Amino acid sequence: MKTSLGKAALLALSMMPVTVFASHWSYEGEGSPEHWGALNEEYKTCQNGMNQSPINIDATFKTHLSPLDTHYIDGPITLINNGHTIQAALKTTTADTITIDGTPFILQQFHFHAPSENTVHGKHYAMEMHLVHKNAKGAVAVVAVMFEQGAENTELNKLWATMPEQAEQTAKIVTQMDLNALLPIDKTYWRFSGSLTTPPCSEGVTRIVLKHPLTLSSAQLAKFSHAMHHDNNRPVQPLNGRVVIE
């Protein structure tokens, strides 16, 4: 079952940049999150799934999680406005990886949501970045980094400088960026089993939410919001008995 779920999530992940422009799901009106499950037979999990993301992180179970092992050296090469988010793509031969439970996961892309999708004790952050990875078996792991409004984020400016302002536009990233600078120094985290937060909402995704937020300025947040024209966060979903560990 886990293998099939992982393959479904991988398929959705690999197809997203190509199909997302034609998709009729959205964050507003008849295509908004509460209607996703009825829009397409392939989206039924958005409505019927029991391990959906995002969630509100409140009660947690303390355990001995291994430190998050990140190995980011390449950085992104293009920035895409797909109408749903701003997404950074990497070269197909990237060496950017994380290691979870001894297994390497290769970074596929990363993108942003404003306000945050996951909440902590009911609190939304100004923005949330999702770093999407997969391993050799097709399993998907997503690392979330929160941003609160405050000081300008210098590294984020390297992305924002080439941000496409219209949907279906792609821009080349001209300034080499250090992806490690978009991670907090303290990489302690919460972990739970979840799903993709966009259709088809495939489950079997390892979700990791870093505890310590970064900052971005009000101007940086406004630029993202202007490009999106709307909030792009799915509401939190029921835990349905799931346990969040830390």
Swiss-Prot record:
Enzyme class: lyase
Catalytic activity, as annotated: hydrogencarbonate + H(+) = CO2 + H2O
Annotated binding of substrate, by residue: T197, T198
Signal peptide extent: 1-22
Keywords: Disulfide bond, Lyase, Metal-binding, Periplasm, Signal, Zinc
Active site per database record: H84 (proton acceptor)
Cofactor: Zn(2+)
Main subcellular location: periplasm
Residue span(s) of domain Alpha-carbonic anhydrase: 23-246
Keyword Hydrolase attributed: no
Disulfide bonds: C46-C201
SUPFAM superfamilies assigned to the protein according to its UniProt record, in alphabetical order: Carbonic anhydrase (SSF51069)
EC number in record: 4.2.1.1
Subcellular location: Periplasm
Family: Belongs to the alpha-carbonic anhydrase family.
Functional summary from the UniProt entry: Reversible hydration of carbon dioxide.
Protein name from the UniProt record: Carbonic anhydrase
Gene: cah
